[in-house]
Amino acid sequence: MGRWVNQSYTDGFFLLGIFSHSQTDLVLFSAVMVVFTVALCGNVLLIFLIYLDAGLHTPMYFFLSQLSLMDLMLVCNIVPKMAANFLSGRKSISFVGCGIQIGFFVSLVGSEGLLLGLMAYDRYVAVSHPLHYPILMNQRVCLQITGSSWAFGIIDGVIQMVAAMGLPYCGSRSVDHFFCEVQALLKLACADTSLFDTLLFACCVFMLLLPFSIIMASYACILGAVLRIRSAQAWKKALATCSSHLTAVTLFYGAAMFMYLRPRRYRAPSHDKVASIFYTVLTPMLNPLIYSLRNGEVMGALRKGLDRCRIGSQH
């Protein structure tokens, strides 16, 4: 068994990827790269806007900047290696590189799942207790929310990385995925993985199902508060406050829960790859668009930034 572990450590793995070199797949690969570029630029721009514009220094935008940072790190962890392997035709990844990719991926997905869940509490307080919002969502609370999201996500990532890399791998080293995804990697292990499967399921319940339950409970309370609002303008503002977050939640949790919480007998590598593309590339692109295009404050900050650049260039 040790011989196989050493061989895996030395030789690494092969990522079979999601694209072939057919004409159709070349078009799809180009589309993914466009999405990656938009995600990269959109999240970087949103982080800078929130940092530079004093009008966006509020709890909601602080959480949004952290969400954009997570999305930015997530796409940079997955897409560049996938693109390099596709363009070079090598498809290889080292054992250490695979472990690092797993650690970052699990940490970031877990952190984002928790942060989206805790952001629902922020929306609940904003709608249901607007007068107490500055007290209930003070700076210390905001730092605790983001800090706990990052901390638990990183702990989850380290646990799964150590557990996955500690298994013996023998026979085929071909991972049927476009990155080192834990469940695809486990299929190559020549040891009983039932304990790891249980650990993975427990982590998914804590990082996905529990925050999703918090979100549903928060929005049930928000709905009750909205129904009690008699002013049409206030009712519209309350819905606008929550709609962006609810859209992001649906996109992220829909794909992630489909990926990790459905029974194994319904799993197929092709389905897993498509679901992974959705929440590792598409969602990070859509989040900044959802929060900026539908938000007057962000668009206003962008216009002010462009005006400053234009005035500066004239001088």
Curated annotation (Swiss-Prot):
InterPro entries hit by this protein: GPCR_Rhodpsn (IPR000276), GPCR_Rhodpsn_7TM (IPR017452), Olfact_rcpt (IPR000725)
Keywords noted in UniProt: Cell membrane, Disulfide bond, G-protein coupled receptor, Glycoprotein, Membrane, Olfaction, Receptor, Sensory transduction, Transducer, Transmembrane, Transmembrane helix
UniProt keyword Glycoprotein, yes or no: yes
Location(s), subcellular: Cell membrane
Residues with glycosylation annotation: 6
Molecular functions (GO terms): G protein-coupled receptor activity; olfactory receptor activity
Membrane topology listed for this record: Multi-pass membrane protein
Membrane-side (Extracellular) residue stretches: 1-31, 80-99, 171-198, 260-272
CDD domains: 7tmA_OR2T-like (cd15421)
GO cellular component term of the entry, any: plasma membrane
UniProt KW Membrane keyword: yes
Cytoplasmic side: 53-58, 121-149, 220-238, 294-315
PANTHER family per the UniProt record, alphabetical: OLFACTORY RECEPTOR (PTHR26453)
Family named by the database record: Belongs to the G-protein coupled receptor 1 family.
Function: Odorant receptor.
Protein name in UniProt: Olfactory receptor 2V1
